[in-house]
């Protein structure tokens, strides 16, 4: 499986049928978020050469991915309608599974963490990724961008976003945006910046939580961003907006699983597709 966890890094991993890693590869990107077919090929080739009885290849990509492995749009990578699945299948003559990276990470939290069958997974890193499980079935939607809350505008007068709108959640609470604000700010302001971000996050979560009756929201990210300061503010705002006598309290928590959860989840997705097609 292949994932893009950081702006300057692409990772690949070969795993066994239990999702345990047997070989790991990392390459620095030539430019920030610059990924093309050759870059992905350079990661997969040594893994493929060193591994026997490969059942498939998994690609976890940031952005909107359809059921045919087409990356319809990735603002981080600057991709539109890239058929990465077909390109990799032709190169390696193996079945290829392509998922949104947040969806892949959610699979790991569901199977190896504390995630329940009705949950939302939110990742705060370069951008804001999201994925939803309902009755243990991933929600993809029509386009299919189900769970993607990063480009909901919470402040139409806010900072401009790469998608063309202003004040998107991604510009307000992503790790990249918050690190930039924290570095420019006085130490006394840092807690208030994280609390403000948590309030924005709780506001954005209130609609999907109320609409879908989700019991669990799992937030994944570095501990300098995803910590008690941010999460308690998000929880307070979510409670304020969704609390009622008939709606049990939805818990916002840090992701239980750590490490390369996207790679592991994508490997599990490859195994699922392999067994389903047998």
List the predicted regions and their residue ranges.
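Phosphate-binding/catalytic loop of phosphoryl-transfer enzymes
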Residues: 53, 57-60, 64-169, 271, ...
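ATP-binding/phosphotransfer module of carbohydrate and carboxylate kinases, centering on a glycine-rich
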Residues: 1-53, 112-113, 157-160, 165-278
């Amino acid at each position: 499986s292949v994932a893009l966890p950081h702006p300057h890094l692409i990772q690949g991993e070969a795993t066994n049928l239990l999702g345990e890693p047997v070989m790991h590869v990392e390459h620095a990107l030539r430019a920030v978020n610059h990924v093309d077919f050759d870059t992905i090929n350079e990661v997969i080739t040594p893994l493929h050469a060193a591994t026997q009885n490969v059942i498939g290849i998994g690609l976890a990509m940031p952005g909107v991915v359809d059921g045919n492995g087409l990356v319809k749009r990735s603002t981080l990578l600057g991709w539109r309608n890239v058929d990465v699945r077909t390109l990799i299948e032709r190169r390696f003559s193996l079945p290829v599974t392509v998922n949104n990276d947040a969806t892949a990470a959610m699979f790991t939290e569901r199977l190896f963490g504390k995630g329940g069958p009705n949950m939302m997974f939110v990742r705060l890193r370069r951008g804001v990724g999201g994925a939803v499980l309902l009755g243990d079935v991933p929600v993809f939607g029509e386009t299919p961008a189900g769970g993607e809350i990063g480009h909901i505008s919470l402040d139409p007068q806010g900072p401009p976003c790469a998608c063309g709108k202003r004040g998107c959640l991604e510009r307000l609470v992503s790790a990249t945006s918050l690190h930039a604000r924290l570095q420019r700010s006085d130490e006394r302001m840092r807690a208030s910046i994280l609390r403000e971000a948590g309030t924005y996050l709780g506001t954005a979560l209130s609609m999907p939580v109320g609409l879908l009756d989700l019991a669990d929201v799992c937030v994944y990210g570095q501990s300098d961003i995803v910590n008690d300061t941010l999460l308690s503010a998000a929880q307070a705002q979510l409670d304020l907006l969704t609390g009622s006598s008939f709606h049990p309290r939805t818990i916002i928590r840090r992701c239980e699983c750590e490490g390369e959860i996207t790679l592991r989840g994508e490997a599990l997705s490859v195994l699922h597709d392999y067994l389903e097609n047998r």
